[in-house]
């Protein structure tokens, strides 16, 4: 465990961060721990930025197509009525904390169902009252039809991709840190890799501007969904995972080998 007091992290040549599903609940402690490690992958400053989903707003400002999001902040002191007016008027939508891991605190609701809408208001209010920013996004219907795609980059290079079944079924509510994702395929799609390259370039551009230098990411998982026929974009970015996102290492023997090779390359850099 990253917060185990009996571990002397100074003795580690390189620390690779993977299973830290509780970091969001102890974010400040995790940030301090990461900064204390001499050689950590991914880099502490990069994980710091990625630990708050407001990064999506920053990437959107740089031209990435992100699902339109309403950001709710604790300091706004919003009433239940004000929350109601900020939710979509039709269709399904998603409410989740801006600082979370493994989908915890995520709920899917139906705009025109009074009971569901009321539950969404209570959900958002609970998060805000506990000092946690909230994001509200319309649920894209094409996710139910086509699922999601995860593109995995290792040491900055396109490595493999997986196609996943939708996780947020109607009335989905999450209070757990981990939810099993159903992978339907690991076939490669050249179009999605072209989109992924656009995302990778923008992410690295932001890292350069933020850190003052480029940082080669050991791992980078980009989650995308294809746009629908009436959407303004061909694809949308759901998330960029640089901390503890699943890399689907058990889905294909080559995935684990590629990740091990990537680590070995960095250790002997």
Residue ranges and their predicted role:
Residues 1-39, 46, 78-79:
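ATP-binding N-terminal substructure of ATP-dependent carboxylate-amine bond-forming enzymes
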Residues 18, 72, 164:
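Conserved residues at the C-terminal ends of beta-strands
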Residues 20, 98, 139-140, 152, ...:
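Anionic group-transfer/hydrolysis microenvironments
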Residues 23-25, 102-105, 144-145, 160-162, ...:
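Short catalytic/ligand-binding loop motif for oxyanion handling, primarily in non-cytosolic enzymes
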Residues 27-28, 52-53, 148, 252-253:
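Conserved strand-to-helix beginnings and helix N-cap segments that scaffold or border functional pockets
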Residues 34-38, 45-146, 190-193:
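Active-site nucleotide/adenylate-binding loops and adjacent lid/helix of ATP-dependent enzymes
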Residues 111-209, 225-226, 235-236:
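Phosphate-binding site of ATP-dependent enzymes
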Residues 157, 172, 191-269:
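ATP-dependent carboxylate activation and anion-phosphoryl transfer catalytic cores
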């Amino acid at each position: 465990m990253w917060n185990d007091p009996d571990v002397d992290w100074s003795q580690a040549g390189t620390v690779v961060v993977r299973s830290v599903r509780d970091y969001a609940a102890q974010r400040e402690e995790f940030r301090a721990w990461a900064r204390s490690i001499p050689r950590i992958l991914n880099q502490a400053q990069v994980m710091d930025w990625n630990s708050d989903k407001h990064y999506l707003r920053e990437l959107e400002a740089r031209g990435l197509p992100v699902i339109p999001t309403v950001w709710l902040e604790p300091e706004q002191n919003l009433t239940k009525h004000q929350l109601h007016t900020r939710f979509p008027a039709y269709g399904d939508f998603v409410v989740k904390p801006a600082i979370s891991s493994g989908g915890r605190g995520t709920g899917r609701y139906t705009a025109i169902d009074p009971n569901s809408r009321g539950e969404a208001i209570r959900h958002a209010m609970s998060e805000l009252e506990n000092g946690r920013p909230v994001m509200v996004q319309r649920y894209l219907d094409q996710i139910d039809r086509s699922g999601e795609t995860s593109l995995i980059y290792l040491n900055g290079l396109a490595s493999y991709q997986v196609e996943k079944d939708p996780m947020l079924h109607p009335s989905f509510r999450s209070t757990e840190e981990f939810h099993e994702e159903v992978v339907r395929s690991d076939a490669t799609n050249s179009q999605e890799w072209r989109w992924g390259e656009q995302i990778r370039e923008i992410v690295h551009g932001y890292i350069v501007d933020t850190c003052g230098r480029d940082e080669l990411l050991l791992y980078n998982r980009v989650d995308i969904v294809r746009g629908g026929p009436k959407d303004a974009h061909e694809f949308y970015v759901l998330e960029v995972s640089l901390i503890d996102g699943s890399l689907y290492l058990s889905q294909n023997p080559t995935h684990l080998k590629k990740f091990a090779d990537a680590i070995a390359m960095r250790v002997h850099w």
